[in-house]
Amino acid sequence: MCARWKNAADTGSQSSQGKVPKRGDESRQRRRTLPEALLYPDGPAKDRTRDKENGKMSQKLRVGILGATGMVGQRFISLLENHPWFEVVTVAASPRSAGKTYEEAVGGRWKMDTPMPEAVKKIVVMNVNEVEKVASTVDFVFSAVDMSKDEIKAIEEEYAKTETPVVSNNSAHRWTPDVPMVVPEINPEHFDVIKYQQKRLGTTRGFIAVKPNCSIQSYAPVLTAWKEFEPYEVVATTYQAISGAGKTFKDWPEMEHNIIPYIGGEEEKSEKEPLRLWGKIEDGVIVPATEPVITCQCLRVPVLNGHTAAVFVKFRKKPTKEQLIEALRNFKGLPQELELPSAPKHFIQYLEEDNRPQVSEDVNYENGMGVSIGRLREDKVYDYKFVGLSHNTVRGAAGGAVLCAETLKAKGYITKK
């Protein structure tokens, strides 16, 4: 995944017929076509700096990763390599890792399928608890810390109060009423609650924004695409990969040839978090929607990456199958309109084959940022049923958080200090 931004910072000196990877071409084109006010929300003079080596204009924001040595932290490191807008300059972790280089701190626990980026290997790990020290080095942070929920809530607020925006992968603040929980294609307007949060925190720049649970990525976007048909009752069963627990088969050999029919806390998250995505801002807080009613079972299955969901839906305005497929294929959100660097060109793909989506074939659709849907058909008890698949550590974790940060930058909430 780290190679996705290869050459993204190059200028257009090479033609489109040169040997520049296609993704790099798209990233550069996106940077050129974004409105100046979105690329540089504080104005060109403040937000653009000159690359001393080649004289080119660049405007990378300095990023810190909290919890950088864990699986999600590693995914952040991997995804942000050569990112056109963001540069990892600080990595922070527990006191036992502090003082070591990132390479030493991770040791043999690098779990990505691509090599550790050279740019981060020699960065000295900072103590995540030294909030002021860490915050002084960055423009904003991604949070993937492994602590108790109360500890996470406290430390993320500490960072926000240093006027450092926090984009969190953690669940601790997902139900804090004035903290936006966002899938940028679904509810980017919820970022507007930040101004109320800042009043509570006493900040002008610092805030917390979070992304939702990985389990809902395979069906919440689909139900959003079908909103006009008024889905009101949903039954879902999720089949969740072991990387969602921060594990590989090497770490968790007992998961081979095994299924565990329980994942602590996942069913409640899977039932309630979509309703918050579909909620509205009222009196400075986010009020969740009340429909559709969702009931869910979550199973851990012997797959490394990729959460699959089998979903049944009832509609108040029952559509045809063709209408549902058309809605999926036409669905896009703000990231697609702005052509943000991490945004999939086509958020949802519908697959006609009876044996799709498959993890082995489809989990990396749109670099892991897209959602794959198949087996849509009428049901004898519900109106329709389908199968969804998403990448749990990309779209469902670090990648989703990176897209949130890109959206926040485009909307002017994240700027250089």
Annotated model-derived regions:
Residues 243-417:
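Charged docking surfaces used in two-component/phosphorelay signaling
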Residues 55-261, 292-293, 365, 371-372, ...:
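N-terminal Rossmann-like NAD(P) cofactor-binding subdomain of oxidoreductases
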